[in-house]
Amino acid sequence: TIPYKEKVIPYLDELDKDAEAIGAVNVIKLVQTKGKRKLIGYNSDLLGFTQSIEPLLEPFHKKALILGTGGASKAINHGLQQLGLETLFVSRSRHDANTVTYEELTPEIMAEYKVIVNCTPVGMYPQADKCPEIPYECLTPQHLLYDLLYNPDTTLFMKKGSDQGAV
């Protein structure tokens, strides 16, 4: 979990193809053959995410904002691209050409990117009264919000999106 999904990689003997492409691991398998131990890294976030979001996608869901740039966001980015969506990262600071800051989220960007995935810990218990700082007033019923957080059941991010009609 945060931030060890990336930091553990140098200690592993092997990565499966998805974990290697993503650059993050959340499952480690210990394989012992003829007295030799081998640690293999996998990423189950990819499969869990793509299988859960794919049925929710509509033809107008072509572009996605990924909130956060940690290990989980890498799996989400890989999964969204596998599903044919163009992605843009949102972070507190600009890292590269494929990243914007929260302050740079204009109504035009919000209108263009109809899928928004929260990959940050913002809003997780015990700070359930917080949420990522996006312009929620720009959300519409065509927007699909997805939160990786599981505690609380309904995060403030999801509630504020729902209040604007987002799914």
Please provide the spans of the model-predicted regions:
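Active-site glycine-rich loop that binds ribose-phosphate moieties when present
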Residues: 48-59, 71, 98-104
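Glycine-rich adenosine-cofactor-binding loop
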Residues: 43-46, 53, 62-81
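Short, well-ordered alpha-helices that flank and scaffold nucleotide-derived cofactor binding pockets
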Residues: 10-13, 51, 55, 78, ...
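Short helix-loop-beta connector
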Residues: 57-63, 140-141
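Rossmann-like adenosine-cofactor binding region
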Residues: 97-167
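Phosphate/diphosphate ligand-binding glycine-rich loop within oxidoreductases
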Residues: 1-56
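Short glycine-rich anion-binding loops that position phosphate/pyrophosphate groups of nucleotides
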Residues: 2-9, 72, 121-124, 151
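NAD(P)-binding Rossmann-fold cofactor-contacting core
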Residues: 82-100
